[in-house]
Amino acid sequence: MRMYETIFIVQPDLGEEELKGISARVQEVIVSMKGELKRLEDWGARKLAYPIEKFNRGRYYYLRFDGDAALIAELERRLRLNDKIIRYQSVKLEKEAPAAAAIPAKVTEEEPVEAAPEAKVETTTEEE
């Protein structure tokens, strides 16, 4: 099984019951196609970069799941057929991202910077 992530945007004017119904149907598709849902996040309503179907705002959802090609095809088909969903994008992830603690920080030693010697200004007076 491969890991995928999907972000979809729903219309901003939907009620809580409709939003729960949409997320339940998405979860149902993943489970029915023998996928494993890792994460489902509601990112809330945000301003869109440009108007989509006369909407300036949208409610964003983020999914991360394991599945096969048939699952992603069926999920995208269902997202496309739902007129309450105005955009979606699915991406195949190469592998699980390592935790930040697992990546060693690159340590560099800094040499102390010595202050530049102050320049002395000499003034000469001309004698007649």
From Swiss-Prot:
Regions of compositional bias (Basic and acidic residues) in chain numbering: 117-128
UniProt region (Disordered), positions on chain: 105-128
Gene Ontology BP terms: translation
Cellular component annotations (GO), alphabetically ordered: cytosolic small ribosomal subunit
Entry keyword set: Ribonucleoprotein, Ribosomal protein, RNA-binding, rRNA-binding
GO molecular function per UniProt: small ribosomal subunit rRNA binding; structural constituent of ribosome
Similarity-based family: Belongs to the bacterial ribosomal protein bS6 family.
Protein task: Binds together with bS18 to 16S ribosomal RNA.
Database matches in NCBIfam families: S6
Protein name: Small ribosomal subunit protein bS6
Species per Swiss-Prot/TrEMBL record: Geotalea daltonii (strain DSM 22248 / JCM 15807 / FRC-32)
Gene: rpsF
